[in-house]
Amino acid sequence: MIGWFLFPQILAIFAPKADNNPSISYGNHLLIKTNSNTTKESAIAAIAQGDHQEAEQLLQKSLAQRPNDPESVIYLSNLQTGSNPFKIAVVVPATTNPNVAQEILRGVASAQTQINQQGGINGRKLMVIVVNDDNQPQISKEVASELVKNPDIIAVIGHNAPDASAAPIYEKGGLLMISSTSPANNLSSAGNYIFRLVASKSNITEKLANYIVNTAKVQKIAFCYDSQAPDNVSFKDELMANVAKKGGQIVPIVCDLSVPNFKADQALNQAISGGANGLFVVAHVDRLDPVFEVIRFNRQRLPLFSSPTFYNIRILEDGGKNVQGLTVAVPWHPSLNQTFANLMQEQWRSPVSWRTVTSFDATRVIIAGLRENPQRHGLQFRLRSGNFHRTEATGKISFDPNTGDRIGQPVLIQVRSTPSGEQFVPLP
């Protein structure tokens, strides 16, 4: 059990700056407020005060009450790393989208716990700094700058925000960033220190367009999206181009989910009267409410298609039977590695999402690189070398040395009715 005498070493990770920055936490700040209790809050207060023995006991007690809380698992692991651990950061939208944040953190927490229980990386355990950027570009840049300035941080997992605004900061600062969730195309040209574990937007839209036109036989498709979400706009534009390239037609309608007093019924009527026999709908992951109006008014009249954003438990829970047949292109599905999915579900007491598994693999990739070269530049060089190959939960992992993109293809899934309700199932 860690003693009070290690507090100065842990505090030194970000001291004195991190203690004053509530967005960066090794355990001294509560970031995920929706999955908390008074015991966890007392544990975090104890860490901030240097009473790590008390904090460890309180975190264990909190996890007995809330075993699916990854933030607590990470903070508990951090208390048990001893001296001279490797330190990485993970950046999540802790306040604006705590569900997505926890999906990412569960993957990182599982990988951290696993490697530390095995004795660490060449004898050095792994400490994880949790960072909140709320998917906001300006905050992303600010926390990225702070992480770059800290020489102890050797790699970053994130950001979830799709605009890649922080990538140039990591590139300039020589700090490896590996995105486990963002399909943004501009990550492919962001520099040598930027990597991506999921398929690019180009690959995702190409695969989905091929299914829409050639498999689902949708000749005319209409589009609903949030014009205030840059990732929505770029995904919509790329999918439109790919659909047209494959011989499909775009039905022009006014269906902007971001406008005040959005009228879903008018948009659906316009699409149907225009001859659409398919509908693509997508929204910002933090602003899904208008989507359910579209889904409700559609009443399964038009087959639905969407981006990876819709591989989300809320789509199933709030969409119900009206989302049956929804087809989405995603990086991963549990059926591709059912044994691993079952283990993760047992650990976290909830279904495993693709974000959890890609974040687990992102952490495993960093761990593998650190075994061979435990420096910022050396880690980047190893992953970029062209002969880095791993087989992890999501399958074979290697990176294009020119772009940093993972080599591989997305998976098509569709909502089907099952005895336990609507579920996403993979398409053959």
Regions found by a protein language model. Name each.
Residues 1-428:
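Extracytosolic ligand-binding ectodomains
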